[in-house]
Amino acid sequence: MEIEKNAKIPFCENTLINAVLSEYRTKAEQEGLEFSARIQMPKELACDEAEFCVMLSNLLENSLDAAKSYIAISIKHLNHQLSLNVKNDYEGELKKSAENNYLTTKPQGSGLGLKSVEAILKSNSGFLKIEDTDGVFDVFATLKN
């Protein structure tokens, strides 16, 4: 059996999450960005799979819009908990509201991506930590699985 030269190895056994990651890998490569992923998760999720994919898509979309040269993602499953980490480098200044919330820099963006991530995590007793240091935007989220 011959393997196609440009064939992509799946990220994980979960079909829906693999599809999301594959889509964003393709988009990142089309933008000339390095896309790295370390995924260690079960095939089946105990948490709402659709909500997890919405959260993942929103974080990756934000990274894709802002990344200067790379996007790095890590998903781990340990002790009935999923942890998700999305990082990208960026140039320029980030905008924040008076309440210290991040604001969209997209000309036609709604700014609802992070808000929907926060809402999903809140409804699932999750945790969100966002840091921006030395030109790196780093989002870390955990939720029960």
Locate predicted features.
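Conserved ATP-binding N-box helix of the HATPase_c
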Residues: 49-71
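Conserved short strand/loop->alpha-helix "switch" segment adjacent to the catalytic nucleotide/phosphoryl-transfer site
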Residues: 9, 35-55, 105
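Short alpha-helical Gxxx[C/S/T] motif in the catalytic ATP-binding
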Residues: 113-117
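Short beta-strand/loop element within the Bergerat-fold HATPase_c
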Residues: 70-80
